[in-house]
A protein has these predicted regions:
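Cross-family detector of peptidyl-prolyl cis-trans isomerase
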Residues: 1-118
Length: 118
């Protein structure tokens, strides 16, 4: 992967450029996503996917409703775009992990698609 790494430590790569507007703080982002654990430099176990449920996920951008890596990684996307996010623990679930599915200090890999902004 030819990823761009930001000052915070988030890495991302656009797999399909969007053509619509980028979301603004407070707007609702409607997404499809799949998340995997990143283990030993490779995609590990899948832990969640909106595609598997057949229902997009939505959240207000920049309001702390999702992990920091999502708020940062989605902010510069455009509607219709697809992006791979590689999220270090400090921008993910950190030392606490999540729900017995994501271990403490896990690096996460997400494939996300910005479907709509409202």
């Amino acid at each position: 992967m030819a990823m761009t790494t930001t000052a915070s430590g988030l890495s991302y790569e656009d797999t399909r450029a969007g053509t619509g507007a980028s979301p603004q703080q407070g707007q609702t982002c409607v997404m499809h996503y799949t998340g995997w654990l990143w283990e030993n430099g490779a995609k590990g176990a899948k832990f969640d996917s909106s595609l598997d449920r057949g229902k997009p996920f939505n959240f207000p951008l920049g309001q702390g409703r999702v992990i920091k890596g999502w708020d940062e990684g989605v902010a510069s996307m455009q509607i219709g775009g697809q992006r791979t996010l590689l999220i270090p623990p400090k921008l993910g679930y950190g030392e606490r992990g999540a729900g017995g599915v994501i271990p403490p200090n896990a690096t996460l890999l997400f494939e996300v698609e910005l479907l709509e902004v409202r």
